[in-house]
Amino acid sequence: MAAKDVKFGNDARVKMLRGVNVLADAVKVTLGPKGRNVVLDKSFGAPTITKDGVSVAREIELEDKFENMGAQMVKEVASKANDAAGDGTTTATVLAQSIITEGLKAVAAGMNPMDLKRGIDQAVIAAVEELKKLSVPCSDSKAIAQVGTISANSDETVGTLIAQAMEKVGKEGVITVEEGTGLQDELDVVEGMQFDRGYLSPYFINKPETGAVELETPFILLADKKISNIREMLPVLEAVAKAGKPLLIIAEDVEGEALATLVVNTMRGIVKVAAVKAPGFGDRRKAMLQDIAILTGGTVISEEIGMELEKAALEDLGQAKRVVINKDTTTIIDGVGEETTIQGRVTQIRQQIEEATSDYDKEKLQERVAKLAGGVAVLKVGAATEVEMKEKKARVEDALHATRAAVEEGVVAGGGVALVRVAAQLTELRGQNEDQNVGIKVALRAMESPLRQIVSNAGEEPSVVANNVKAGDGNYGYNAQTEEYGNMIDFGILDPTKVTRSALQYAASVAGLMITTECMVTDLPKGDAPDLGAGAGGMGG
Protein backbone atom coordinates (compact mmCIF):
# COMPACT_ATOMS: atom_id res chain seq x y z
CA MET A 1 0.00 0.00 0.00
CA ALA A 2 1.30 3.47 -0.95
CA ALA A 3 2.48 5.83 1.79
CA LYS A 4 0.00 8.57 2.73
CA ASP A 5 0.35 12.27 3.35
CA VAL A 6 -1.82 13.44 6.28
CA LYS A 7 -2.63 17.04 7.22
CA PHE A 8 -4.56 18.20 10.30
CA GLY A 9 -6.50 21.24 11.50
CA ASN A 10 -5.67 24.62 10.04
CA ASP A 11 -3.00 23.26 7.64
CA ALA A 12 -5.62 21.02 6.00
CA ARG A 13 -8.31 23.71 5.89
CA VAL A 14 -6.04 26.37 4.35
CA LYS A 15 -5.04 24.00 1.53
CA MET A 16 -8.66 22.99 0.97
CA LEU A 17 -9.81 26.62 0.85
CA ARG A 18 -7.14 27.41 -1.74
CA GLY A 19 -8.57 24.70 -4.02
CA VAL A 20 -12.13 25.93 -3.43
CA ASN A 21 -11.12 29.46 -4.42
CA VAL A 22 -9.35 28.41 -7.63
CA LEU A 23 -12.41 26.52 -8.86
CA ALA A 24 -14.99 29.07 -7.67
CA ASP A 25 -13.04 32.04 -9.09
CA ALA A 26 -12.92 30.32 -12.50
CA VAL A 27 -16.65 29.54 -12.43
CA LYS A 28 -18.00 32.81 -11.03
CA VAL A 29 -16.71 35.03 -13.86
CA THR A 30 -19.56 33.57 -15.95
CA LEU A 31 -22.38 34.79 -13.64
CA GLY A 32 -24.97 37.32 -14.78
CA PRO A 33 -25.82 39.10 -18.05
CA LYS A 34 -22.33 40.61 -18.26
CA GLY A 35 -20.54 37.43 -17.21
CA ARG A 36 -17.39 36.65 -19.22
CA ASN A 37 -16.48 33.58 -21.22
CA VAL A 38 -14.06 30.87 -20.14
CA VAL A 39 -11.91 29.13 -22.78
CA LEU A 40 -11.32 25.43 -22.16
CA ASP A 41 -8.42 23.72 -23.91
CA LYS A 42 -9.15 20.31 -25.41
CA SER A 43 -6.57 17.60 -26.05
CA PHE A 44 -7.66 17.64 -29.71
CA GLY A 45 -9.58 20.10 -31.89
CA ALA A 46 -10.45 23.72 -31.21
CA PRO A 47 -10.82 24.93 -27.62
CA THR A 48 -14.35 25.20 -26.21
CA ILE A 49 -15.70 28.61 -25.24
CA THR A 50 -18.41 28.55 -22.59
CA LYS A 51 -20.41 30.59 -20.11
CA ASP A 52 -21.85 27.47 -18.49
CA GLY A 53 -20.65 27.15 -14.89
CA VAL A 54 -20.79 23.37 -14.66
CA SER A 55 -18.77 22.94 -17.89
CA VAL A 56 -16.00 25.09 -16.41
CA ALA A 57 -16.10 23.26 -13.07
CA ARG A 58 -15.84 19.83 -14.74
CA GLU A 59 -12.59 20.81 -16.48
CA ILE A 60 -10.69 21.76 -13.33
CA GLU A 61 -8.16 19.40 -11.74
CA LEU A 62 -5.39 20.78 -9.52
CA GLU A 63 -1.86 19.45 -9.13
CA ASP A 64 -1.73 19.71 -5.32
CA LYS A 65 -3.74 16.76 -3.96
CA PHE A 66 -5.10 18.65 -0.92
CA GLU A 67 -6.15 21.69 -2.95
CA ASN A 68 -7.71 19.35 -5.50
CA MET A 69 -9.88 17.76 -2.79
CA GLY A 70 -11.32 21.20 -2.01
CA ALA A 71 -11.93 21.91 -5.69
CA GLN A 72 -13.58 18.52 -6.30
CA MET A 73 -15.99 19.02 -3.39
CA VAL A 74 -17.18 22.33 -4.84
CA LYS A 75 -17.40 20.68 -8.27
CA GLU A 76 -19.88 18.30 -6.60
CA VAL A 77 -22.03 21.33 -5.64
CA ALA A 78 -22.19 22.49 -9.27
CA SER A 79 -22.93 18.97 -10.56
CA LYS A 80 -25.68 18.34 -8.01
CA ALA A 81 -27.38 21.68 -8.74
CA ASN A 82 -27.16 20.86 -12.45
CA ASP A 83 -28.69 17.39 -11.96
CA ALA A 84 -31.52 18.67 -9.76
CA ALA A 85 -32.62 21.74 -11.68
CA GLY A 86 -30.44 21.85 -14.81
CA ASP A 87 -29.20 25.33 -14.00
CA GLY A 88 -27.99 27.50 -11.10
CA THR A 89 -24.55 25.89 -11.12
CA THR A 90 -22.66 29.19 -10.93
CA THR A 91 -24.97 30.53 -8.20
CA ALA A 92 -24.43 27.35 -6.18
CA THR A 93 -20.64 27.65 -6.54
CA VAL A 94 -20.65 31.32 -5.45
CA LEU A 95 -22.81 30.48 -2.42
CA ALA A 96 -20.57 27.55 -1.46
CA GLN A 97 -17.41 29.66 -1.73
CA SER A 98 -18.89 32.36 0.49
CA ILE A 99 -20.15 29.93 3.17
CA ILE A 100 -16.82 28.04 3.23
CA THR A 101 -14.68 31.22 3.39
CA GLU A 102 -16.73 32.85 6.16
CA GLY A 103 -17.19 29.53 7.98
CA LEU A 104 -13.46 28.75 8.05
CA LYS A 105 -12.74 32.28 9.35
CA ALA A 106 -15.12 31.55 12.24
CA VAL A 107 -13.43 28.18 12.90
CA ALA A 108 -10.02 29.90 12.95
CA ALA A 109 -11.44 32.38 15.49
CA GLY A 110 -12.24 29.47 17.80
CA MET A 111 -15.92 28.71 17.06
CA ASN A 112 -17.15 25.12 17.29
CA PRO A 113 -17.40 23.75 13.70
CA MET A 114 -20.35 21.44 14.52
CA ASP A 115 -22.39 24.32 15.97
CA LEU A 116 -21.51 26.49 12.96
CA LYS A 117 -22.83 23.75 10.68
CA ARG A 118 -26.04 23.46 12.73
CA GLY A 119 -26.54 27.22 12.45
CA ILE A 120 -25.98 27.15 8.67
CA ASP A 121 -28.44 24.24 8.27
CA GLN A 122 -31.05 26.02 10.40
CA ALA A 123 -30.74 29.19 8.27
CA VAL A 124 -31.05 27.23 5.01
CA ILE A 125 -34.20 25.38 6.15
CA ALA A 126 -35.80 28.71 7.11
CA ALA A 127 -34.62 30.31 3.83
CA VAL A 128 -36.22 27.55 1.73
CA GLU A 129 -39.58 28.17 3.47
CA GLU A 130 -39.26 31.93 2.78
CA LEU A 131 -38.42 31.25 -0.88
CA LYS A 132 -41.60 29.20 -1.22
CA LYS A 133 -43.60 32.17 0.12
CA LEU A 134 -41.97 34.52 -2.42
CA SER A 135 -42.54 32.11 -5.31
CA VAL A 136 -45.20 32.90 -7.92
CA PRO A 137 -46.53 30.34 -10.43
CA CYS A 138 -45.06 30.49 -13.94
CA SER A 139 -47.78 29.53 -16.36
CA ASP A 140 -48.03 32.03 -19.20
CA SER A 141 -45.87 32.04 -22.30
CA LYS A 142 -44.36 35.45 -21.55
CA ALA A 143 -42.97 34.35 -18.16
CA ILE A 144 -41.64 31.10 -19.66
CA ALA A 145 -39.88 33.06 -22.41
CA GLN A 146 -38.33 35.41 -19.81
CA VAL A 147 -36.98 32.52 -17.73
CA GLY A 148 -35.54 30.88 -20.86
CA THR A 149 -33.95 34.17 -21.93
CA ILE A 150 -32.24 34.74 -18.56
CA SER A 151 -30.95 31.18 -18.38
CA ALA A 152 -29.60 31.32 -21.95
CA ASN A 153 -27.50 34.33 -20.86
CA SER A 154 -29.96 36.97 -22.08
CA ASP A 155 -30.51 35.44 -25.54
CA GLU A 156 -34.12 36.39 -26.34
CA THR A 157 -34.49 34.19 -29.41
CA VAL A 158 -33.79 31.09 -27.31
CA GLY A 159 -36.32 32.09 -24.64
CA THR A 160 -39.02 32.73 -27.25
CA LEU A 161 -38.34 29.43 -29.05
CA ILE A 162 -38.65 27.45 -25.81
CA ALA A 163 -41.90 29.23 -24.93
CA GLN A 164 -43.29 28.40 -28.41
CA ALA A 165 -42.23 24.76 -28.04
CA MET A 166 -43.94 24.49 -24.64
CA GLU A 167 -47.07 26.09 -26.08
CA LYS A 168 -47.16 23.55 -28.92
CA VAL A 169 -46.47 20.33 -27.00
CA GLY A 170 -47.74 21.32 -23.55
CA LYS A 171 -45.85 21.32 -20.27
CA GLU A 172 -45.57 17.51 -20.40
CA GLY A 173 -44.29 17.29 -23.97
CA VAL A 174 -40.78 16.20 -24.78
CA ILE A 175 -38.52 18.97 -26.08
CA THR A 176 -35.15 17.91 -27.42
CA VAL A 177 -32.21 20.03 -28.55
CA GLU A 178 -30.27 19.13 -31.70
CA GLU A 179 -27.58 20.75 -33.81
CA GLY A 180 -29.21 22.44 -36.80
CA THR A 181 -27.82 22.80 -40.31
CA GLY A 182 -28.36 26.52 -40.96
CA LEU A 183 -27.52 29.78 -39.21
CA GLN A 184 -30.99 30.28 -37.73
CA ASP A 185 -32.56 28.47 -34.78
CA GLU A 186 -35.59 26.42 -35.83
CA LEU A 187 -38.48 24.73 -34.07
CA ASP A 188 -39.78 21.45 -35.43
CA VAL A 189 -42.97 20.07 -33.85
CA VAL A 190 -44.27 16.53 -34.29
CA GLU A 191 -47.91 16.31 -33.26
CA GLY A 192 -49.52 12.99 -32.42
CA MET A 193 -47.65 9.83 -31.49
CA GLN A 194 -44.48 9.14 -33.42
CA PHE A 195 -42.25 6.09 -33.09
CA ASP A 196 -39.06 4.98 -34.84
CA ARG A 197 -40.33 2.28 -37.15
CA GLY A 198 -40.92 2.71 -40.89
CA TYR A 199 -42.91 0.73 -43.49
CA LEU A 200 -41.97 -2.94 -43.94
CA SER A 201 -42.17 -2.73 -47.73
CA PRO A 202 -41.70 0.22 -50.10
CA TYR A 203 -44.64 -1.16 -52.13
CA PHE A 204 -46.99 0.29 -49.49
CA ILE A 205 -45.99 3.86 -50.54
CA ASN A 206 -49.00 5.76 -51.91
CA LYS A 207 -47.45 9.24 -52.03
CA PRO A 208 -44.44 8.75 -54.34
CA GLU A 209 -43.58 12.49 -54.34
CA THR A 210 -42.82 12.40 -50.60
CA GLY A 211 -41.91 8.69 -50.40
CA ALA A 212 -44.49 8.21 -47.65
CA VAL A 213 -47.57 6.14 -46.88
CA GLU A 214 -50.57 8.26 -45.87
CA LEU A 215 -53.71 6.58 -44.56
CA GLU A 216 -56.86 8.63 -43.88
CA THR A 217 -59.14 7.42 -41.01
CA PRO A 218 -57.55 3.95 -40.94
CA PHE A 219 -58.31 0.98 -38.72
CA ILE A 220 -55.25 -0.05 -36.67
CA LEU A 221 -54.52 -3.69 -35.87
CA LEU A 222 -52.14 -4.20 -32.92
CA ALA A 223 -50.63 -7.67 -32.52
CA ASP A 224 -48.03 -8.78 -30.00
CA LYS A 225 -46.69 -11.56 -32.25
CA LYS A 226 -45.03 -12.31 -35.58
CA ILE A 227 -47.49 -12.65 -38.45
CA SER A 228 -46.30 -14.97 -41.21
CA ASN A 229 -49.49 -16.89 -42.08
CA ILE A 230 -52.07 -14.90 -44.06
CA ARG A 231 -54.92 -17.24 -43.00
CA GLU A 232 -54.83 -15.74 -39.50
CA MET A 233 -55.52 -12.32 -40.97
CA LEU A 234 -58.24 -13.07 -43.50
CA PRO A 235 -61.26 -12.36 -41.22
CA VAL A 236 -59.87 -8.93 -40.28
CA LEU A 237 -58.91 -8.07 -43.87
CA GLU A 238 -62.38 -9.00 -45.14
CA ALA A 239 -64.11 -6.94 -42.43
CA VAL A 240 -61.90 -3.91 -43.17
CA ALA A 241 -62.45 -4.25 -46.94
CA LYS A 242 -66.23 -4.26 -46.35
CA ALA A 243 -65.94 -1.12 -44.20
CA GLY A 244 -64.04 0.52 -47.08
CA LYS A 245 -61.28 1.95 -44.90
CA PRO A 246 -57.48 1.51 -44.96
CA LEU A 247 -55.70 -0.72 -42.42
CA LEU A 248 -52.44 -0.21 -40.51
CA ILE A 249 -50.89 -3.32 -38.99
CA ILE A 250 -48.48 -2.87 -36.07
CA ALA A 251 -46.99 -6.22 -35.07
CA GLU A 252 -43.75 -7.72 -33.77
CA ASP A 253 -43.06 -8.53 -37.43
CA VAL A 254 -44.94 -9.28 -40.65
CA GLU A 255 -43.04 -11.60 -42.96
CA GLY A 256 -43.15 -14.19 -45.72
CA GLU A 257 -46.49 -15.07 -47.25
CA ALA A 258 -48.43 -12.62 -45.07
CA LEU A 259 -46.34 -9.62 -46.18
CA ALA A 260 -46.44 -10.70 -49.85
CA THR A 261 -50.25 -11.02 -49.79
CA LEU A 262 -50.67 -7.59 -48.18
CA VAL A 263 -48.42 -6.02 -50.84
CA VAL A 264 -50.40 -7.68 -53.68
CA ASN A 265 -53.73 -6.55 -52.17
CA THR A 266 -52.44 -2.98 -51.88
CA MET A 267 -51.07 -2.88 -55.43
CA ARG A 268 -54.33 -4.20 -56.85
CA GLY A 269 -56.29 -1.69 -54.81
CA ILE A 270 -58.44 -4.36 -53.14
CA VAL A 271 -57.71 -3.00 -49.67
CA LYS A 272 -55.31 -0.22 -48.70
CA VAL A 273 -52.86 -1.72 -46.16
CA ALA A 274 -49.55 -0.78 -44.56
CA ALA A 275 -47.53 -2.77 -42.02
CA VAL A 276 -44.87 -1.63 -39.54
CA LYS A 277 -42.95 -3.31 -36.74
CA ALA A 278 -43.95 -2.49 -33.18
CA PRO A 279 -41.62 0.01 -31.45
CA GLY A 280 -39.20 -1.03 -28.67
CA PHE A 281 -38.12 -4.46 -27.48
CA GLY A 282 -39.26 -6.96 -24.86
CA ASP A 283 -41.39 -5.54 -22.05
CA ARG A 284 -41.03 -2.00 -23.38
CA ARG A 285 -42.58 -3.12 -26.70
CA LYS A 286 -45.60 -4.58 -24.88
CA ALA A 287 -46.02 -1.35 -22.91
CA MET A 288 -45.77 0.82 -26.04
CA LEU A 289 -48.28 -1.34 -27.93
CA GLN A 290 -50.63 -0.86 -24.98
CA ASP A 291 -50.04 2.93 -25.18
CA ILE A 292 -50.97 2.91 -28.88
CA ALA A 293 -54.05 0.78 -28.11
CA ILE A 294 -55.22 3.30 -25.49
CA LEU A 295 -54.51 6.25 -27.81
CA THR A 296 -56.48 4.71 -30.70
CA GLY A 297 -59.23 3.00 -28.72
CA GLY A 298 -58.18 -0.49 -29.80
CA THR A 299 -57.03 -3.72 -28.13
CA VAL A 300 -53.65 -5.45 -28.37
CA ILE A 301 -54.23 -8.93 -29.82
CA SER A 302 -52.02 -11.00 -27.54
CA GLU A 303 -51.92 -14.72 -26.91
CA GLU A 304 -50.89 -13.96 -23.33
CA ILE A 305 -54.47 -12.89 -22.61
CA GLY A 306 -56.02 -15.65 -24.73
CA MET A 307 -56.85 -13.60 -27.84
CA GLU A 308 -56.32 -15.05 -31.29
CA LEU A 309 -55.82 -13.11 -34.50
CA GLU A 310 -58.36 -15.23 -36.42
CA LYS A 311 -61.09 -14.21 -33.97
CA ALA A 312 -60.31 -10.49 -34.03
CA ALA A 313 -63.25 -8.29 -35.02
CA LEU A 314 -63.52 -4.64 -36.09
CA GLU A 315 -64.31 -3.66 -32.46
CA ASP A 316 -60.80 -4.80 -31.46
CA LEU A 317 -59.13 -2.43 -33.93
CA GLY A 318 -58.02 1.07 -33.05
CA GLN A 319 -58.78 4.10 -35.22
CA ALA A 320 -57.13 7.43 -35.94
CA LYS A 321 -57.83 10.46 -38.09
CA ARG A 322 -54.63 10.01 -40.07
CA VAL A 323 -51.42 7.99 -40.15
CA VAL A 324 -48.20 8.98 -41.95
CA ILE A 325 -45.42 6.41 -42.41
CA ASN A 326 -42.05 7.04 -44.02
CA LYS A 327 -38.80 5.08 -44.22
CA ASP A 328 -37.90 5.47 -40.53
CA THR A 329 -40.93 6.77 -38.61
CA THR A 330 -44.64 6.22 -38.12
CA THR A 331 -46.87 9.05 -36.87
CA ILE A 332 -50.41 8.45 -35.61
CA ILE A 333 -52.43 11.68 -35.58
CA ASP A 334 -55.64 12.14 -33.54
CA GLY A 335 -56.31 8.66 -32.18
CA VAL A 336 -59.94 8.11 -31.16
CA GLY A 337 -59.14 6.79 -27.66
CA GLU A 338 -61.15 8.21 -24.76
CA GLU A 339 -59.56 11.19 -23.02
CA THR A 340 -60.19 9.77 -19.52
CA THR A 341 -58.50 6.45 -20.40
CA ILE A 342 -55.51 8.28 -21.90
CA GLN A 343 -55.20 10.46 -18.77
CA GLY A 344 -55.38 7.35 -16.60
CA ARG A 345 -52.52 5.80 -18.57
CA VAL A 346 -50.47 9.01 -18.29
CA THR A 347 -50.96 9.04 -14.51
CA GLN A 348 -49.87 5.40 -14.33
CA ILE A 349 -46.66 6.08 -16.32
CA ARG A 350 -45.93 9.15 -14.16
CA GLN A 351 -46.10 6.91 -11.13
CA GLN A 352 -43.51 4.64 -12.78
CA ILE A 353 -41.28 7.68 -13.41
CA GLU A 354 -41.40 8.47 -9.67
CA GLU A 355 -40.30 4.92 -8.87
CA ALA A 356 -37.70 4.52 -11.66
CA THR A 357 -34.10 4.51 -10.47
CA SER A 358 -32.10 4.77 -13.70
CA ASP A 359 -32.00 7.98 -15.78
CA TYR A 360 -32.41 5.95 -18.98
CA ASP A 361 -35.68 4.39 -17.75
CA LYS A 362 -36.94 7.80 -16.62
CA GLU A 363 -36.17 9.32 -20.01
CA LYS A 364 -37.96 6.52 -21.90
CA LEU A 365 -41.01 6.76 -19.62
CA GLN A 366 -41.02 10.56 -20.03
CA GLU A 367 -41.05 10.08 -23.81
CA ARG A 368 -44.06 7.79 -23.50
CA VAL A 369 -45.92 10.40 -21.45
CA ALA A 370 -45.13 13.05 -24.06
CA LYS A 371 -46.36 10.87 -26.91
CA LEU A 372 -49.65 10.25 -25.12
CA ALA A 373 -50.14 13.72 -23.65
CA GLY A 374 -48.78 16.25 -26.08
CA GLY A 375 -46.20 15.64 -28.71
CA VAL A 376 -42.52 16.11 -29.37
CA ALA A 377 -40.72 19.34 -30.25
CA VAL A 378 -37.17 19.53 -31.58
CA LEU A 379 -35.18 22.76 -31.16
CA LYS A 380 -32.57 22.94 -33.91
CA VAL A 381 -29.75 25.26 -32.89
CA GLY A 382 -28.18 27.27 -35.70
CA ALA A 383 -24.69 28.81 -35.64
CA ALA A 384 -21.91 29.93 -37.97
CA THR A 385 -19.13 27.70 -36.61
CA GLU A 386 -18.76 24.38 -34.80
CA VAL A 387 -17.36 26.13 -31.68
CA GLU A 388 -20.31 28.53 -31.48
CA MET A 389 -22.75 25.67 -32.10
CA LYS A 390 -21.45 23.67 -29.11
CA GLU A 391 -21.52 26.70 -26.81
CA LYS A 392 -25.03 27.68 -27.91
CA LYS A 393 -26.40 24.14 -27.64
CA ALA A 394 -25.20 23.93 -24.01
CA ARG A 395 -26.93 27.26 -23.27
CA VAL A 396 -30.19 26.16 -24.90
CA GLU A 397 -30.19 22.92 -22.88
CA ASP A 398 -29.64 24.96 -19.68
CA ALA A 399 -32.48 27.29 -20.59
CA LEU A 400 -34.78 24.35 -21.28
CA HIS A 401 -34.06 22.82 -17.87
CA ALA A 402 -34.62 26.17 -16.19
CA THR A 403 -38.01 26.68 -17.85
CA ARG A 404 -39.12 23.18 -16.82
CA ALA A 405 -38.04 23.97 -13.25
CA ALA A 406 -39.99 27.26 -13.41
CA VAL A 407 -43.17 25.53 -14.54
CA GLU A 408 -42.72 22.96 -11.75
CA GLU A 409 -42.16 25.20 -8.69
CA GLY A 410 -42.77 28.76 -9.91
CA VAL A 411 -40.41 31.74 -10.14
CA VAL A 412 -38.87 34.40 -7.89
CA ALA A 413 -37.22 37.75 -8.68
CA GLY A 414 -33.89 37.12 -10.41
CA GLY A 415 -30.53 38.85 -10.26
CA GLY A 416 -29.82 37.55 -6.75
CA VAL A 417 -32.66 39.68 -5.31
CA ALA A 418 -34.78 36.79 -3.95
CA LEU A 419 -31.97 35.58 -1.68
CA VAL A 420 -31.32 39.12 -0.41
CA ARG A 421 -35.03 39.46 0.52
CA VAL A 422 -34.98 36.03 2.19
CA ALA A 423 -31.91 36.99 4.26
CA ALA A 424 -33.66 40.22 5.35
CA GLN A 425 -36.63 38.18 6.64
CA LEU A 426 -34.35 35.96 8.74
CA THR A 427 -32.36 38.58 10.68
CA GLU A 428 -34.21 37.65 13.90
CA LEU A 429 -33.41 33.92 13.54
CA ARG A 430 -31.48 32.55 16.53
CA GLY A 431 -29.78 29.24 17.33
CA GLN A 432 -29.27 27.49 20.68
CA ASN A 433 -25.91 29.15 21.39
CA GLU A 434 -23.63 31.92 20.13
CA ASP A 435 -21.67 29.65 17.76
CA GLN A 436 -24.90 28.60 16.04
CA ASN A 437 -25.86 32.28 15.72
CA VAL A 438 -22.54 32.87 13.92
CA GLY A 439 -23.41 29.95 11.58
CA ILE A 440 -26.76 31.59 10.81
CA LYS A 441 -24.98 34.91 10.07
CA VAL A 442 -22.50 33.12 7.77
CA ALA A 443 -25.39 31.65 5.74
CA LEU A 444 -27.30 34.96 5.59
CA ARG A 445 -24.17 36.86 4.49
CA ALA A 446 -23.57 34.25 1.78
CA MET A 447 -27.08 34.88 0.39
CA GLU A 448 -25.91 38.31 -0.79
CA SER A 449 -22.94 36.87 -2.70
CA PRO A 450 -24.74 36.05 -6.01
CA LEU A 451 -26.01 39.66 -6.29
CA ARG A 452 -22.54 41.02 -5.45
CA GLN A 453 -20.90 38.76 -8.04
CA ILE A 454 -23.37 39.74 -10.81
CA VAL A 455 -22.65 43.42 -10.07
CA SER A 456 -18.90 42.84 -9.91
CA ASN A 457 -18.95 41.07 -13.31
CA ALA A 458 -20.83 44.07 -14.73
CA GLY A 459 -17.99 46.34 -13.59
CA GLU A 460 -19.95 48.15 -10.85
CA GLU A 461 -19.25 48.50 -7.11
CA PRO A 462 -20.94 45.53 -5.32
CA SER A 463 -21.33 47.17 -1.88
CA VAL A 464 -23.08 50.28 -3.25
CA VAL A 465 -25.55 48.25 -5.33
CA ALA A 466 -26.16 45.70 -2.53
CA ASN A 467 -27.02 48.54 -0.08
CA ASN A 468 -29.38 50.18 -2.60
CA VAL A 469 -31.14 46.86 -3.25
CA LYS A 470 -31.43 46.14 0.49
CA ALA A 471 -32.97 49.60 0.99
CA GLY A 472 -35.80 48.65 -1.39
CA ASP A 473 -38.34 45.91 -0.85
CA GLY A 474 -40.29 43.22 -2.73
CA ASN A 475 -38.98 42.66 -6.26
CA TYR A 476 -36.91 45.88 -6.34
CA GLY A 477 -33.44 45.08 -7.66
CA TYR A 478 -30.62 45.97 -10.04
CA ASN A 479 -30.69 45.16 -13.75
CA ALA A 480 -27.00 44.63 -14.59
CA GLN A 481 -27.77 44.52 -18.33
CA THR A 482 -29.18 48.07 -18.48
CA GLU A 483 -27.53 49.32 -15.25
CA GLU A 484 -30.82 50.53 -13.74
CA TYR A 485 -32.86 49.83 -10.61
CA GLY A 486 -36.51 48.75 -10.61
CA ASN A 487 -38.95 45.87 -10.35
CA MET A 488 -37.15 42.68 -11.48
CA ILE A 489 -40.42 41.01 -12.55
CA ASP A 490 -41.23 44.01 -14.82
CA PHE A 491 -37.69 43.84 -16.23
CA GLY A 492 -38.40 40.17 -17.04
CA ILE A 493 -35.54 39.02 -14.80
CA LEU A 494 -36.86 35.84 -13.19
CA ASP A 495 -35.22 32.79 -11.64
CA PRO A 496 -36.98 29.45 -11.18
CA THR A 497 -37.61 28.87 -7.45
CA LYS A 498 -36.34 25.31 -7.82
CA VAL A 499 -32.99 26.52 -9.22
CA THR A 500 -32.44 29.04 -6.40
CA ARG A 501 -33.57 26.54 -3.75
CA SER A 502 -31.35 23.72 -5.08
CA ALA A 503 -28.33 26.03 -5.37
CA LEU A 504 -28.67 27.11 -1.73
CA GLN A 505 -29.32 23.61 -0.35
CA TYR A 506 -26.43 21.90 -2.17
CA ALA A 507 -23.99 24.76 -1.44
CA ALA A 508 -24.80 24.63 2.28
CA SER A 509 -24.63 20.83 2.36
CA VAL A 510 -21.09 20.58 0.94
CA ALA A 511 -19.85 23.74 2.69
CA GLY A 512 -21.04 22.36 6.04
CA LEU A 513 -19.00 19.20 5.48
CA MET A 514 -15.89 21.19 4.58
CA ILE A 515 -16.13 23.49 7.62
CA THR A 516 -16.25 20.44 9.90
CA THR A 517 -13.17 18.84 8.28
CA GLU A 518 -10.29 18.30 10.73
CA CYS A 519 -8.01 15.92 8.82
CA MET A 520 -7.17 15.21 5.16
CA VAL A 521 -5.43 12.11 3.82
CA THR A 522 -3.98 11.63 0.34
CA ASP A 523 -1.34 9.52 -1.42
CA LEU A 524 2.19 10.89 -1.27
CA PRO A 525 3.42 12.10 -4.67
CA LYS A 526 5.59 9.39 -6.26
CA GLY A 527 8.81 11.38 -5.99
CA ASP A 528 8.37 12.04 -2.25
CA ALA A 529 7.72 8.46 -1.17
CA PRO A 530 10.68 7.06 0.81
CA ASP A 531 12.78 4.75 -1.36
CA LEU A 532 12.66 1.52 0.62
CA GLY A 533 14.52 -0.44 -2.04
CA ALA A 534 17.87 1.38 -1.79
CA GLY A 535 20.15 -1.67 -1.88
CA ALA A 536 22.81 -2.47 0.69
CA GLY A 537 26.15 -1.25 -0.58
CA GLY A 538 28.26 -3.93 -2.26
CA MET A 539 31.65 -4.76 -0.84
CA GLY A 540 34.35 -2.72 -2.47
CA GLY A 541 37.07 -4.75 -4.00
Swiss-Prot record:
SUPFAM superfamilies: GroEL apical domain-like, GroEL equatorial domain-like, GroEL-intermediate domain like. NCBIfam families: GroEL, PRK00013.1, PRK12849.1, PRK12850.1, PRK12851.1. Its EC number is 5.6.1.7. This is Chaperonin GroEL. Pfam families: Cpn60_TCP1. It comes from the Bacteria. Belongs to the chaperonin (HSP60) family. ATP binds at T30, L31, G32, P33, K51, D87, G88, T89, T90, T91, G415, D495. It comes from Pantoea ananas (Erwinia uredovora).
